[in-house]
């Protein structure tokens, strides 16, 4: 299985084989993810009065787990899961930078912001949901969805409706 997330990875009989070398000379995930955020913020800051659409698929919390050096040790967790916690912390920071840019530019008051996952938990079920990623059961496709739209969505409101993006 090869996909957009891992174009240099091929799964053969449940064994991962990476292709030799990097896809692009000099590519470093640790440095590129902050660059993606910088470019998103630049787009927001240069948007002007016309409506625009920004799709920003964040890498955290997906693999590869490669927090930038400035986030190492910031996740508040020690031991085996510390690197993953740093990665999730970096993801939170990334979203915060985008929200801050919307505030600074005065766009936050009339901008719909959505944050969601793309599938259920990857490796194990999380009760009360049954199963995990790639399953037809709820644990394979139910994930959090958060939306902020001042004047349209009440802050701290909860909806139990099914949505589809």
Name every feature range the model reports, one short phrase each:
Residues 37, 41-45, 92, 99, ...:
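Non-transmembrane alpha-helical segments in soluble domains
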Residues 13-25, 71-79, 149-153:
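Short glycine/proline-rich turn/loop motifs
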Residues 64-67, 76-81, 86-87, 93, ...:
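Histidine-centered active-site microenvironments of extracellular/periplasmic hydrolases
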Residues 30, 34, 139, 159-163:
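Short, solvent-exposed loop/helix junctions and linker helices
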Residues 45, 71-73, 88:
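Beta-propeller domains with acidic blade repeats across secreted/periplasmic ectodomains
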Residues 21-34, 76-90:
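The substrate-binding groove and active-site-proximal loops of carbohydrate-active enzymes
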Residues 1-51, 58, 64-67:
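Formylglycine-dependent
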Residues 54-57, 114-116:
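Short beta-strand segments
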């Amino acid at each position: 299985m090869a996909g957009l997330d891992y174009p240099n990875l091929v799964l053969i009989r449940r064994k991962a084989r990476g292709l030799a070398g990097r896809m692009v000379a000099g590519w470093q995930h640790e440095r590129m993810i902050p660059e993606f955020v910088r470019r998103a913020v630049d787009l927001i800051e240069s948007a002007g009065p016309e409506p625009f659409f920004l799709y920003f698929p964040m890498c955290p919390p997906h693999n590869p787990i490669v927090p930038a050096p400035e986030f190492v040790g910031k996740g508040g967790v020690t031991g085996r899961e510390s690197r993953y916690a740093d990665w999730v912390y970096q993801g939170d920071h990334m979203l915060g930078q985008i929200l801050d840019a919307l505030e600074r530019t005065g766009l936050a008051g009339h901008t719909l912001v959505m944050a969601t996952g793309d599938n259920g938990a990857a490796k194990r079920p999380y009760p009360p949901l049954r199963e995990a990623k790639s399953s037809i059961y709820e644990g394979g496709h139910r994930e959090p969805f958060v939306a902020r739209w001042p004047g349209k969505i009440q802050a701290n409101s909860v909806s139990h409706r099914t949505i589809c993006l």
